Each structure stands twice: as structure tokens, then as C-alpha cells.
């Protein structure tokens, strides 16, 4: 999942006027870590491209959430694989409920740096263990979003999760980003190198969402 890496990354967003993440700048000031090496790498072509791609992605996701809340103001906003992302807060309309989901160690850090606010809950879980479904009250509607998350999932894991969500949250909306097979191979060799992904071909990739994902389930 893509998290703020350095103040330089935030500066790229600001210079391009694409995405202003003041929370990212605030968090970097709170984290006791030397970002100098990351800062040096942030000026490379791939890193600059990645920064702009992330900025556009966050804009797109925020638009989808805000658009859904315009019609369902009391709905829940669920950030799948949240890391230290604050998109839910950025889209808060004053009446929605925000859930942030991630692994226990990630949520432990989040609770320190981004304690849950009003109408917000941080949930420790494995997204593939659908026990977390029981903690989401979707009676007023639900929009789920996954930002830079499904790159780490096998295609079958995404399919199983999506079908299970369709069963448990009828009428809900799921928004996520994805890349085609060629791009996933490139990402695995660069940004996801630390994940030690071996069989890239088994991981989630999409070239044509309508023709590839729609057949998974008639409700999609």
C-alpha cells in the first residue's frame, strides 16, 4: 500500500496542484525516521511518475466517496488496507461513519499516530478473513475503497472477497485501483520489491474491468 514516504513527495503533490495531503506532512513530522535516503530517490523518473500516479488515484477515490455520500449521507465509508491513509476523514460529511481496516501491527501504529475520531473506528483484521464483515453497519449504505492494496492479492483472493462482499453488503459500492499485467510486473520489480512476490502472473491485474471482472458475479 502506498503511504507518504517523504516531505518531498508531498511537495510534488503541491507543485502539481493535484492532491494536497496536509495530514501526510503532519505524520512525517511525527515519525522518528530518517527519510533522507528516500528523499534522494524521490527525484528519479519512476518515483516522480509514481508520485503523480498516487496523487491522481487519491483524487479519483475521494471523488467516488464524496459522490456516493452525496446520495447516501449517513452511509459508512470503509478504507480497506488503510495504512496511515486519511481519505475517509478528508471526505467526512459530518454524518457518515468511517472504518479503517488493516493488519493488527498496522492498526497499532495508526492508533498512535491517527487515533480514531468522532464516527470513526480502526479495525484490526485480515481482509481475507471475512469476520470483519460483522463489524460494519451498512444499514444506511456503504462504500468501500482499496488504495494500492489489491496489488498484494492473488486474483482468486480478490474474486472471493468481492463475491463475499456482494453477499453481505447488497447495494454497496467497492472502488479500487488496478493495473494491467505488464504494469503489475513492473510494480513488482520496483515499488513492491520488498513484498518478495515470485509468481507475478497469479497476482491481481486487470486490462478490461468490464470483460474480466463482470463475469465473476451477476451482481457486479
Placement of each model-derived feature along the sequence:
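A short, conserved alpha-helix within the catalytic core of class I
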Residues: 152-165
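Short amphipathic alpha-helix with an adjacent loop that forms part of the alpha/beta core around
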Residues: 130-139
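Short alpha-helix
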Residues: 200-220
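SAM cofactor-binding core of SAM-dependent methyltransferases
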Residues: 56-125
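Short, glycine-/aromatic-enriched active-site segment of Class I SAM-dependent methyltransferases
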Residues: 185-200
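A conserved beta-strand element that flanks and buttresses the S-adenosyl-L-methionine
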Residues: 144-145
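Conserved beta-strand signature within the Rossmann-like core of class I S-adenosyl-L-methionine
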Residues: 168-181
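Single conserved hydrophobic/aromatic residue that forms the stacking wall/gate
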Residues: 2-13
